[in-house]
Amino acid sequence: MYYVYILYCQKDGKLYIGFTSDLKKRILKHKSGFVLATKHRRPIRLIYYEGYLHEDDARQREKYLKGGKGHSELKIQLAHILDKLGYKYANTRY
């Protein structure tokens, strides 16, 4: 199984979108500071993930979500969660 996941980085209030084949292990690495992209943005919180049978499907979805249209749709889909977290919508790429 392959996963696309979204983290909320509490320090800067931004999102991180990633891909992995082992979700539990990857989240532990993020939380422990072993991932450079989120090391200085901790604490982090897993707010969403999707599972895929094929690696290519997961990678395509990750790429789409990181793009403008996909990211906009993501914000709409997760609006209730993001509002509770105090996510700043204006002028944010992630």
Spans of model-derived segments:
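Short, electropositive, low-hydrophobicity segments enriched in small/polar residues
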Residues: D22, A37, H71-L74
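GIY-YIG nuclease catalytic motif and its immediate N-terminal context
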Residues: M1-V35, R42, Y49-L53, D57-K63, ...
